[in-house]
């Protein structure tokens, strides 16, 4: 509602959807929204557009909300294809598990470094199922590269680290890991319990990785179509993902 009210007088092209902006800015504030739209207007003028187009807003979102600036640095073609599959995999698993949840996905890296990102709406896991869905989505990048190229994704270390942290939270809140095995003397977990927890966590991570792989295998056409879209356009918004998925049905 805030976004709709703020944009009511903006000269927007027909391809601009309010829902795209809302989903791409999960923590929207009036100040940030104003900065995004001011930059989008400048982009529009610079590009010679009659109205503010979706591409103008997308570029502004990348620069303002995600601090991703354009770079002249070229990425190796084969490496870019793997990056595109990695980010597409995050988006595909997110959309399959929770349709409409992915707001923006891009292969543009930060500070000229190869990479990309996929970001969803401002959602908070309400239960264990939703929490494990988030972990599954986090592991999807590595699974996607393995599925399509049959190699280990060396760019996935940050994802694995994030998934590991999420599983620590899962054990504490959902798996009872925070309630047993405490040594009374210094209020710390026993070595036996730590080893037990690590074994549970590793097994669960493996299970969720295989789950992500299976989802991608079953939606391979969608995955490859999103990869193609990223290679062609660099960045996709929620409506783009919806159109791609519809075309794959």
Indicate residue ranges for each PLM-predicted region.
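Conserved RecA-like P-loop NTPase ATPase core
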Residues: 3, 29, 40, 57, ...
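Short hydrophobic/aromatic residue motifs in ordered secondary structure
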Residues: 32, 89-90
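DNA-binding alpha-helical recognition surfaces that contact promoter or target DNA
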Residues: 35, 59, 243
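Substrate-recognition/cap regions that form aromatic- and gly/pro-loop-enriched pockets
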Residues: 74
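Soluble catalytic regions of large protease machineries
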Residues: 78-85, 91-249
């Amino acid at each position: 509602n805030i976004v709709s009210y703020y944009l009511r007088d903006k000269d927007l092209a027909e391809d601009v959807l309010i829902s795209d902006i809302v989903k791409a800015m999960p923590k929207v504030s009036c100040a940030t929204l104003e900065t995004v739209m001011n930059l989008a207007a400048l982009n529009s003028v610079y590009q010679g557009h009659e109205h503010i187009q979706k591409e103008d807003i997308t570029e502004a979102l990348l620069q303002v909300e995600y601090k991703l600036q354009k770079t002249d640095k070229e990425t190796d073609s084969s490496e870019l294809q793997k990056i595109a599959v990695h980010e597409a995999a995050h988006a595909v698993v997110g959309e399959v598990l929770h349709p409409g949840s992915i707001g923006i996905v891009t292969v543009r890296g930060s500070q000229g470094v190869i990479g990309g990102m996929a970001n969803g709406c401002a959602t908070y896991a309400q239960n264990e199922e939703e929490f494990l869905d988030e972990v599954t989505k986090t592991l999807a990048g590595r699974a996607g590269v393995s599925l399509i190229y049959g190699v280990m994704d060396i760019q996935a270390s940050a994802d694995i680290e994030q998934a590991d942290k999420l599983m620590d939270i899962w054990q504490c809140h959902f798996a009872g890991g925070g309630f047993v095995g405490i040594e009374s003397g210094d209020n710390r977990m026993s070595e036996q319990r730590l080893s037990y927890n690590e074994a549970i966590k590793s097994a669960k991570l493996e299970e969720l990785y295989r789950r992500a792989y299976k989802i991608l295998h079953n939606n391979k056409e969608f995955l490859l179509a999103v990869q193609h879209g990223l290679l062609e356009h660099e960045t996709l918004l929620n409506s783009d993902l919806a159109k791609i998925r519809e075309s794959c049905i």
